[in-house]
Amino acid sequence: MEALAFPTTKLPTTMSDPQQDLDTLRQRVAQLDREILEKIAERLRTSRSIGEAKRRAQLPIRDFRVEASVMQRARSAARELGFDPALAESVLESLIEAAVRTQVESQPVTQPGGRQHILIVGGAGRMGRWLRGFLEGQGHSVETCDPVDGDFASLAQAGQRTWDTVVLSTPLALLPETLQEALQLPGSPLVFDIGSLKSHLVKPLQEAARAGHRVASLHPMFAPGTVVLTGRTVLVCDAGQPDATEQACRLFRETAVSLCPIPLAEHDQVMGGLLGLSHTVNLLFGQALHRLGLRFEKLGPIASTTFAKQARTAAEVAAENPELYHQIQHFNQCTPQVYEALESGLEALRQAALDPDSEVFLARMGECRSYFFPD
């Protein structure tokens, strides 16, 4: 975006009345707010015109490479103008989301040669809704199967149609059963899940692959509120049908997302650290503060930099879906190992903290430092 050029306003001098100075500055802020909003309205009108041009050219609504370029320009402009690039990213994410909604309001575009009929099982959930918007934005025809506000209440009803691709976005506990039902759908569609754990799916997925079913397994490593995919990752697990895995990847390949292969059997061990351990540490942080009787509203104003960073992350974790977070812990076969490592590490650190010999504590910190900075 071009830098906004606003008319100058005479700012107060040091000799003027303080209250008058404050009023003048507030009026200036109000004027700037109005002009910014006018520019946003102009941007949305332009986005609508872009959407119309895309429809005429039969192009998908979203071009993630363009969005990545927009974000890069925003970060560069913020640095040049002397403010935090993260603020620019936040503003542009909201503008991009609004632009996409504006363009989706019109008839969906078609993707020549690549338009698919896709069914999302569990489509009324947060990730299911995100997937529908994502796939429709690329020009695919998408419907959902969900007893809560789905186009179909069951797979039996959805089975009256044929589908090119079926995406499983149900709660983790339902995935094995849902997979078996999806494999019975007519037309032999591509079937893949997006579950955050795979241990309970390894056997049924591999059996399905050996039976000739086109199955794969993906794991988007981002929240369903994500708008811009730059810097985001989707983990890709091959269940034994490489062609099916590649077909699933194609739905994401032309976006800014990174596709990262990971062996299906190793997925949950990695998630034990990436998800299970990180969730646990943040929940423990909040629980410990609560048990210490330290009220958060009193700590905030005097927070150290480290506390502020940790508290922000812990608060975000605490606000997430507790049912999902329990499933991530419960269904991961590596969870006992994670807690054993956490318990032994905590005990070693406790002993080091209470030991008058600082060398013991320095050794524990050294272990941590060598993990993050091996050389």
Question: What spans do the regions from the language model cover?
Answer:
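Rossmann-fold dinucleotide-binding core
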Residues: 197-201, 205-258, 271
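Hydrophobic/small residue at the entry helix of a nucleotide-binding pocket
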Residues: 126-127
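Interdomain hinge/lid region at the active-site interface
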Residues: 298-374
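NAD(P)-binding Rossmann-fold cofactor-contacting core
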Residues: 136-155
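Rossmann-fold NAD(P) dinucleotide-binding segment
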Residues: 158-161, 165-208
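Extended, charge-rich alpha-helical interface modules
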Residues: 4-7, 11-116
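Internal alpha-helical scaffold of NAD(P)-dependent oxidoreductase catalytic cores
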Residues: 233-315
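Conserved N-terminal Rossmann-fold NAD(P)-binding element of oxidoreductases
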Residues: 119-122
